[in-house]
Amino acid sequence: MAQQVQPLLARLKKLVAIESGSRDLEGLATLSALIAQRLQASGLAVQVLPTQAPGFHPQLKGARLGSMVYGTRSGAGQRKVLMIAHMNIVYTQGMGAKQPFRIDGDKAYGLGISDDKGGVALVLHAVPLLDQLGFKDYAQLGVLINADEEIGSAGSGAFITQLGSEYDVVMSFEGGGFTEDYVRLATSSIAIVEMKITGNASHAGSSPERGRNALYEMAHQVLKSRHLGDDAKGLKINWTVGNTGETRNVIPASATAIADVRALGNEDLDRLEAQLRESIKDKRIADTTIELSFYRSRPAFVANAASRVLARRAQDIYAEIGQKLDIRDRATGGGTDAAFAGLRPKGGVLESFGLRGFGAHSSDDEYILVSSIAPRPYLATRMVTDVGSGGLSW
């Protein structure tokens, strides 16, 4: 296994060098071309599929997004296996210069290296590794690398759900922990709430009483709705974006607030939406109007029996090499594409085949643990061989 570390680090270095923020279409096009080239070199039939956000998306509103790369190869086995990861990262263009690829002890640093360049590197490494092992006892091997996961998979989610209904097993390569190695059987559902308040403008000095301050009403609604969350039940609502006013001496006539919502189950979102719609009926500023939109961005991943069989098999594979692998069966606030794959699954879905790391979605330098690399290609290839040949039943 140790001989896989340096080649995989070399792949990571090339991937990290290409900035691929979610709205950086040029960078995403460069990276998707590289990924397509690597998959074609491994004998996969590759499609580069353009994506677009739906017009009703509260933030993206029909925007063109980065393209997905989808590759397939037929084998002689019994089951179809799909590996998924995402090439886009949360950071904006130009931040790569502040976080170049470097290795310091057991830490390999780089922009997006943990979320999810490490996962992409593992997938690109696992496919030729299967060839080296001479293994083709799968009915079909599929790879999907999308480019919009960090913005809710607005253009790729439906396609991932379709593939989940066609493949016997879906392996998702998000990061596999930090202090401990694990695989996941649960992720949170995610929603976007947008609240638009309309009031009436007036001069802030001479006639503020004639205005209807949309900012005041927005503040009232935001503070009031904070208490609708329930951390003990995994329901979180956090207002993260606010826009109002343009001129200092004018009472603002409009205001917009956007919230990020996380829940353990899809039904929790239904209850929260109903509570929010009831809450906005209680207004502080008379003669203001409030428009609320509640967009379900990502479903929850809820494991089925097949997923649990896969998780236990992953533990057994780790035990073969004398290592421990935890199974996380409770969502902790993060959402992933495993949820889309698990909406109408043909078989099992398992999350977190990626590398252990730290710093994703934060101001800290992002890194993966070099010591976490060696077991992961072994886990991925063993899972493909066990599943593809029909060695697991559920």
Residue ranges of model-derived segments:
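Short, conserved micro-motifs enriched in small and acidic residues
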Residues: 108-121, 150, 212-215, 367-374
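Glycine/charged-rich beta-loop-alpha catalytic/anionic-binding loops adjacent to active sites
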Residues: 99-113, 198-201, 322, 362
